[in-house]
Amino acid sequence: MTGSSIVSLMSQSLVVFMIWILPPLIASVIVGLTIGIIQAATQIQDESLPLTVKLLVVVAVIGLFAPVLSAPLIELADQIFTEFPAMTLGY
């Protein structure tokens, strides 16, 4: 296995990571901004409210999108385990 194939696998891993992290991150940012605006308008200064709601939203988004998000992760893991014997031949 050459260095370029390892770099290719690393870049594919980063893309899969971005695919996994973006939906919960976007949902958390939107909910956090919405709750922040509501708290500023009503002058409620409770710190646990935004954290609890964001946590529930992130868990819900991961639960809803897990089947869709798992496909690239499973493909990458299959590719890595298939190519692993070729990676270790020279060592």
Curated annotation (Swiss-Prot):
Its main location: membrane. One of its GO terms (biological process) is protein secretion. The chain crosses the membrane at residues 15-35, 55-75. Keywords: Cell membrane, Membrane, Plasmid, Transmembrane, Transmembrane helix, Transport. It is a multi-pass membrane protein. It comes from the Bacteria. The keyword Plastid does not apply. GO terms for cellular component: plasma membrane. The keyword Hydrolase does not apply. It is found in: Cell membrane. Belongs to the FliQ/MopD/SpaQ family. Could be involved in the secretion of an unknown factor. PANTHER family: FLAGELLAR BIOSYNTHETIC PROTEIN FLIQ, SURFACE PRESENTATION OF ANTIGENS PROTEIN SPAQ. This is Probable translocation protein y4yM.
